[in-house]
Amino acid sequence: MSIKVLNNNDKEVNVLHFQGKNVDILWRTFALVKNYCELNPIEDYLSLVSCWTDNNNCYLYQQLKNNNIELINALPYNYDYTQKWNMINKIKFYIDCLENRVNTKYVMLLDGYDVLFTSTKDILKKFKKTGYRIIFNTSYNNYPEEDIDYIENREEKLGFFHYFNAGCCIGYREDLIRFYKECLDFVYIYNPLQSEQKILRHCFAKYSNDKKQKFIWLDYKREIFHTMALTTCSYDANTRILKINNNYEGDKIKRQNKKKI
């Protein structure tokens, strides 16, 4: 019997992002989700896309393969696996992959090494309900720690998870192509960590404080995506429900440490 994963509002969530070292910190939760979340077939006209170089370490690929669900690798067939990884190329790979998926209307772009599905139920229903063309994951972590995308009254408006996270998104295929092409306009930005997160955030900033735009926004209610940084989890073996809670104590410690600096 499959387990069910709920956010702190008791709503079923679809995708967990164990960003950074959270695969190691929340390894029990990770193992529960990877081994005991049974997934139904993906809805028609929705494609799942990622980039990965090692099938053995791509947990998302392994999970979806075990559930007979296709995960498309955006890396080209002639990709040189010996070359140094370049996040700018990752953006270009996504664009090329999406342009070739002409029969796909919706696409979900996902990190391969620290993302798992908990459910495939009602993904498109939740997405369409937002009214936006693209929805990105959110995180408590402001990474990189710069004022890039301004949102008025960010924390009051969006809650605990209020920063853009590039690890997961869903959108209409043609709009994702448009957005990722716009991201290439920001590749000149100084980016010592070679992170596409910084580039994508600069592009997101073009839209983030425009209250009238309905092009791109954040899944701050965590109805589709849920970042696992600063969370705690509790599992009830009787109901087979895994509950995710915001770690406000961790939040307080983080704020106190910032004040000391």
Feature-to-residue mapping (PLM):
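Short, high-confidence coil segments that cap the C-terminus of an alpha-helix
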Residues: 11-13, 102-104, 131-133, 239
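A generic structural motif
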Residues: 71-81, 136-140, 192-197, 217-224
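A conserved donor-nucleotide-binding helix/loop in the catalytic core
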Residues: 81-110, 116-122, 161-164, 195-199
